[in-house]
Amino acid sequence: MHERDNNMIRISKTSKLDGILSWSLQALETCQGSVNPDGTLVPACSGCYATTGNYNYPNVKAPRLENKSDWKRDAWVSDMVQALDSSRYFRWFDSGDIYSVALAEKIFEVMQQTPWCKHWLPTRMAKFAKYQDVLARMQALDNVMVRFSSDSVSGEFDARHGSVIIENPEALPEGATLCEAYNNGGKCNGCLLYTSDAADE
């Protein structure tokens, strides 16, 4: 993972997604949807990849910590639009999640103002009523794919979910499509299924 600075915007290149750019926050502390009512982590977030390996290095953490305050700037939306000027695909949150409705509204503005860019936003925040309106408006945009992440690691999901974890690829639930990264050493290798509404993964 490599960090890039456009004006004051800190964005990353995600190695799994063939270098597609991403804007991220620190994992868990911005992931309200990762916690059960009793305070334990939901199964899908236990052992989160974004809390291990390279994500623990200070130079990787720093941009995510800066992003948590940087998005509140008045010029953040216009700076993000400029940063995405030559991007055709963009991932929101390779770590972290939408922890604020105000942040979600700003992300929606960026999506509106960058129709040339296909946005992918995986999130667990749809379980909270206050986020459902802005997420629905995001979904209504032609250039946006919001994927609601299931909390399960055993393939359980309901109609709203667009992403679910399974421990055994042979136990793929009916109606779901297996992410090809399973067969490509953890890499997308040009596959863009995650940006379409073709299937769950």
Outline where the language-model segments fall.
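Glycine-rich, charge-decorated loop segments at or immediately adjacent to ligand/cofactor-binding or catalytic sites
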Residues: 130-134
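Conserved small/polar residues in nucleotide/adenosyl-binding loops
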Residues: 194-200
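Extended repeat-based interaction scaffolds and adjacent low-complexity, acidic/S/T/P-biased segments
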Residues: 173-186
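N-terminal [4Fe-4S]-dependent radical SAM core
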Residues: 1-69, 86
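Core AdoMet radical
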Residues: 51-77, 81-103, 111-129, 143-155
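Helix-rich interaction surfaces within compact, conserved domain-sized segments
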Residues: 164-169
